Amino acid sequence: MGTRGLQGLGGRPQGRGCLLLAVAGATSLVTLLLAVPITVLAVLALVPQDQGRRVEKIIGSGAQAQKRLDDSKPSCILPSPSSLSETPDPRLHPQRSNASRNLASTSQGPVAQSSREASAWMTILSPAADSTPDPGVQQLPKGEPETDLNPELPAAHLIGAWMSGQGLSWEASQEEAFLRSGAQFSPTHGLALPQDGVYYLYCHVGYRGRTPPAGRSRARSLTLRSALYRAGGAYGRGSPELLLEGAETVTPVVDPIGYGSLWYTSVGFGGLAQLRSGERVYVNISHPDMVDYRRGKTFFGAVMVG
């Protein structure tokens, strides 16, 4: 007869029950071991996605806040030179101050500080220069433009010329010489001016000579004179009067080589004189044989100035 299996209380066999318990325990253990990693993986898979959404939401809200701050920030635009020259409107300054205070109250941190600095900088540049003249500063009167002399005023310009048998003479129509507005010239009587008035008289006479050759006595000094006289009118024919005079002293140097070389000098002067109609002006020269007759060297004239 075969051997019977173990039996427990009540006569039930114990081998099958133990096997079932062992299988159930192993199944529970395996299920527990698999559930833990799956749960961890599920948590790790869900948590980063959720956190990523939160980061995007935070970044989006920060960008919107920065945009609102940029929109509310005042634009720092340099004023043009024309705006600086205009008179500022006092009603605009309280609005600018209120806007600065509102911006400072709504903004915090470095952005608010930079906004306050920009507002203060704009406030410093805002006052414009007053273009109205200061009553305490004396304004200089504008001078009247200068005008040329009236072309109708009498004037004359005569140039020296050599005349055979007479020596020094004066030309009234050659080169730069002219007579204007009734002025007349006669070689024997001189220059006649038609109107009473103040005249500017001038005279320039060029002189030239030759130094003595070597072996002769030392040359003496020469005093060259030129003068303007007036005659006629209230002074009578025989009573000339000296108006202006110039003089120059020359001491020629002996030429040690041979024949003496040429030397040059000039005597020039000018001034104002009160002349009357009918009076005549003429030139008196001390050394007519030494006069330089080249162009631009010898001349005299008169022009009415008042």
From Swiss-Prot:
Q: What are the boundaries of the region Disordered?
A: 63-112, 127-151
**Where is this protein found?**
Membrane
Entries under Pfam families matching the protein: TNF (PF00229)
Residue positions the entry lists as glycosylated: 98, 284
Q: Where are the membrane-spanning stretches?
A: 28-48
Q: What sequence ranges are listed for the domain THD? A: 154-305
Q: Which GO terms describe its biological process?
A: gene expression; immune response; lymph node development; positive regulation of interleukin-12 production; skin development
Instruction: Please note every region of biased composition (Low complexity).
Output: 74-85
Q: Which molecular function GO terms apply here?
A: cytokine activity; tumor necrosis factor receptor binding
CDD domains membership: TNF
Keyword annotations for this protein? Cytokine, Glycoprotein, Membrane, Signal-anchor, Transmembrane, Transmembrane helix
Q: Which residues lie on this side of the membrane: Extracellular?
A: 49-306
Signal sequence, start to end: none
Would you name any one GO CC term? Answer: plasma membrane
Instruction: Please indicate if the UniProt record lists Transmembrane as a keyword.
Output: yes
- Cytoplasmic side of the membrane: what ranges? 1-27
Amino acid composition bias (Polar residues), ranges on this chain: 95-112
Topology relative to the lipid bilayer, per the entry, is: Single-pass type II membrane protein
Q: Which family does it belong to?
A: Belongs to the tumor necrosis factor family.
Instruction: Name the job this protein performs.
Output: Cytokine that binds to LTBR/TNFRSF3. May play a specific role in immune response regulation. Provides the membrane anchor for the attachment of the heterotrimeric complex to the cell surface.
Question: What does the subunit section of this Swiss-Prot or TrEMBL entry state?
Answer: Heterotrimer of either two LTB and one LTA subunits or (less prevalent) two LTA and one LTB subunits.
Q: What is this protein called?
A: Lymphotoxin-beta
Please tell me the species this chain comes from: Mus musculus
> Lineage of the source organism?
Eukaryota, Metazoa, Chordata, Craniata, Vertebrata
